[in-house]
């Protein structure tokens, strides 16, 4: 999100969000590859890339020389196993807030073996000062029990870090819903005021600018209130650092997790959250050299009460902690169920992705088995004794996210300078087994069951 460019934008009042109708499946939303777009005078669309291999990485959103760049991977998996991969598409050539940015997506119904063409999820109008100028930095989750999917993203023409982006002229937030497993989508609905308003009375002062950490929104395995299992999302916010919010109605309304008067990571940048085995929540936030970790300890799951620990822990300062050498970059945290091969014991396994470095290069994955409650009792416990890392990319590479596919593999979705140093990132998909990531120490329970049949 962050950039060093300078610009100014107009002041607008808040939008009232009404009911949204589901957009029809419009064939005109199919991307036209290999042709110049009349609206783009300097950049061309990237060509479609064949995706016939079922076990190797695939460039889902490729950026070649002199073409409109892609960035910011997000991915979800539906209960039926459909993968939904989302990416920024940037006719303006820069981050969301600087001009027109669209969201595009592709679907796979065979565990990433083949993919649909690109479709438009949300298209910016490119009009300076417009609240619909661009849509970017998507965070996504598919409901574990239905066909519903929700995307939360930035909308408009403000830049997160600019002084002109304030509570009165905020970095705006939109939600987009699907009720058919990501095939069709509602029009974006703005929820800016309902999110910022949560923190207006904070002792840290009102939040001046925020956005949802891109990639994967977390859905609880344990806490169900009414129709849905609880959602968790983490906010990059200024001033005061990260905040965490939760939703019990699948992204329609949100609430602060913990007090609004403190931040779980005052120095945190782009953040993610994951649910721990006991139902508590761990924050993993972008930090130079590694990650900031903090843990929210529940008093009441149903009421959403509890507290964050007083201090976030820097992973690189802990014994055998996660390290991102000479970089500060968005990554993903994911907990899956696994079997330890040496003992045959089932246990949760935490995965954390970062560029291994030096710099934004060599994206990889650390892992940690949660052998007992003590391994995640506190943020310090959680940040200690990681293994790996497994190196995914040998090139310049940056943001990454992941989910577990129905076949047990990890759908790893990451940015890489695939087609040449100095080009903008291509968003790459690579399916990985837990055996690959852990050097044969762990196997996915899903994959193990299939082999035993």
Report residues per predicted region.
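Bacterial Sec-dependent N-terminal signal peptides
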Residues: 1-21
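Asp-box/BNR beta-propeller blade signature and adjacent active/binding-site loops
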Residues: 21-453
